[in-house]
């Protein structure tokens, strides 16, 4: 039962943070950020927020710095929409899975093109 409640809270946090980043954040360091997952601890006091940032490593670093600085603002805004006693402490972590998936897809396409070029006609 508690696991289901934490999963529901994680999904609600993910949805609300995505809205806040899209509509409320005005920090120019914040690039194109997608929230890929949220994990809430069993007691609901801590949440790991996994973000994917489009761009190079400096864009990722700038976005991480902007998110870290905005953590207090984001928690305050979450407290207005979440119906919980304690709003979790937010920790933003880079999620490189989308970037890795794109790289693998590109490598597979290159291999396929290379095989087509070498095939006898």
Swiss-Prot record:
The keyword Cytoplasm applies. One of its GO terms (biological process) is maturation of SSU-rRNA. Its main location: cytoplasm. Keywords: Cytoplasm, Ribosome biogenesis. It is found in: Cytoplasm. One of several proteins that assist in the late maturation steps of the functional core of the 30S ribosomal subunit. Associates with free 30S ribosomal subunits (but not with 30S subunits that are part of 70S ribosomes or polysomes). Required for efficient processing of 16S rRNA. May interact with the 5'-terminal helix region of 16S rRNA. Monomer. Binds 30S ribosomal subunits, but not 50S ribosomal subunits or 70S ribosomes. This is Ribosome-binding factor A. The gene is rbfA.
């Amino acid at each position: 039962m508690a696991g289901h409640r934490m999963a529901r809270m994680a999904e609600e946090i993910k949805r609300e943070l995505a809205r806040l980043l899209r509509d409320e954040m005005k920090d120019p360091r914040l690039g194109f950020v997608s929230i890929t997952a949220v994990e809430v601890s069993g007691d609901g006091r801590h949440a790991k927020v996994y973000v994917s940032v489009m761009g190079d490593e400096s864009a990722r670093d700038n976005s991480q710095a902007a998110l870290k600085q905005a953590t207090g603002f984001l928690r305050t805004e979450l407290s207005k929409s979440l119906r919980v006693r304690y709003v979790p402490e937010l920790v933003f972590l880079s999620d490189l899975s989308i970037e890795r998936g794109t790289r693998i897809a590109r490598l597979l396409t290159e291999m396929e093109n290379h095989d087509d070029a070498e095939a006898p006609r």
